[in-house]
Amino acid sequence: MKVVIVGGVAGGASSAARIRRLDEHAQIIMIERSGYVSYANCGLPYYVGGVIKEQEELTLQTPESFWDRFRIDVRVRQEVTAINPAEKTVTVRALDSGKSYTETYDKLLLAPGAKPTVPALSGVDSERVFTLRTVEDTLRIRRFVEDQKPKTAVLAGGGFIGLEMAENLVEMGVSVTIVQRPKQLLAPLDTDMASFVHAEMRRHGVALRLGETVTRFRQDGDSVLTLLEESEPLRSDMVLLAIGVTPDTHLAKEAGLELGIRGSIAVNERMETSVPDIYAVGDAVEVTHFVTGQKALISLAGPANKQGRIAADNICGGNSHFHGSQGSSVLKLFSLTAASTGINEKAAQAAGIAYDRVVLFPASHATYYPGAQSMAMKVLYEKESLRLLGAQIVGGEGVDKRIDVLATAIRAKMTALELTELDLSYAPPYSSAKDPVNMAGFMIEDLESGKVRQFHWNEVEDLPCDGNATLLDVRTEGEYRRGHLNGFRNIPLDDLREHLDELDRGKPVYVNCQTGLRSYLACRLLTQYGFTCAHLSGGYSFYQVVTQEQQTARSAYPCGMEKL
């Protein structure tokens, strides 16, 4: 059997190695147009920033190591320019010599990946405008940074690569501005959770120009101007385009393969395309979203590697299936970690799913053990079935652990109530006896059993401020003085029983505390004394962070934030 693989990196390289493990006698040819066949593309921003010191540390395999260990024929700096499915051949052009040749195949695997989205704007070809996708891109940026020593940079786009590059440039002393049309960074997060990311970026001096449209770029001497639709131009020493990626599928289209959403390659669960004996994996293919069942593009290394393995199994006569991806991801930003899995509120609404959510602020480990760090956790679940839909966590230590537990729970199709039963490891330096994941389950259990009701930060503006409801803040007097929601009366939780006669049982009570725990306790107390009660999900801390990121909207709130 002769297998030709178009593209290396994650999907192609993992598939090649798997084929060899399954079939020692197969002829395997891997064709890669760049000079690097298998490298850690997720580490590229950290090489630019000097966190990863040596270029060799990014290299996972070389053509020589592939041959020595696997007897795989790797051809770098060569590009497949055409596929002939009828004759089962590919046309290959050697980039250095310009010469072309034809290669036959029995099985063909396409792993072309995705290319940076470059807008059709004037000035994008400036020598000071960069994209980051390959090792060659990385070397070009690093040479520029070392030689030119830029003081300012504009990043067009606020996705994973853009934010990681922003952090690394800031650590190198570069003043960074992020500009993008969407009004929030990190699309997998909901707006409220993204507010924590915005605050962290601003805390480290990153200027955010969100909701703005770039119209063109213009080089002006040793700087480049980023022209905006409704604002003054931004002058900087360099620009990085990090708008996103587009599936690189021109070969598949020209060969007559069926295409999916946004021009991606359509494949089945066996990673087979619409043409016999042609498989496809990685960022170029559409996948089924594990939660919604809808087609999606999920450009992540984890799914690409799994798809490569599955395609290899099937190429070698197996029957393996890829059951979709839920887009689990994690990102380091200065002292913050942001992670998500499954779907967010926007995606749930688009899919027509009736859902609810809980917000909590657990600690990374037992608070009596030194070094505990807080995290904001949001868990979404379907109302009727109680199945888990997604989770988002932003904080310090322990975020990655909890998102992985929740990702596993989603994959296992657990209900939200089953989170209460998870038997997770505990010792004071690592967790609490009731892990944050357990706590999320407990909260959902209380909501669904009717033991407590909640309202959310974006509903504060709708609270009745005309005396038809009791607005109650159960934090300490000192906490209340440092900042509170306008119209809320302060009765500390520990004193609440002594003040019950001052409250009108005929009016609904809306309770607020710092993170949602004391307000929950207050609601349980009040409910048992005949009051109708709801508490603010996430508490004042959550409300404060979110509304500080939405100052214009906040100023219109009749029950907005009042600072004394």
Features from the language model and the residues they span:
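Mid-to-C-terminal Rossmann-like scaffold of FAD/NAD(P)H-dependent oxidoreductases
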Residues: 1, 284-397, 428-432, 436-462, ...
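Beta1-alpha1 glycine-rich phosphate/pyrophosphate-binding loop at the start
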Residues: 1-77, 166-189, 328, 401, ...
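Short hydrophobic core segments
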Residues: 6, 103-113, 156, 234-244, ...
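A Rossmann-like FAD-binding core segment of flavoenzymes
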Residues: 25-27, 69, 75-96, 103, ...
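Rossmann-like dinucleotide-binding cores of NAD(P)H-dependent redox enzymes
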Residues: 59, 152-153, 160-218, 298-304, ...
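Glycine-rich dinucleotide-binding loop and its adjacent helix/turn
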Residues: 110-172, 207, 261, 267-269, ...
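FAD-site-proximal beta/loop scaffold in flavoenzymes
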Residues: 125-149, 233-313, 405, 409
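Rhodanese-like catalytic fold shared by cysteine-dependent sulfurtransferases
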Residues: 417-428, 432-469, 477-510, 514-564
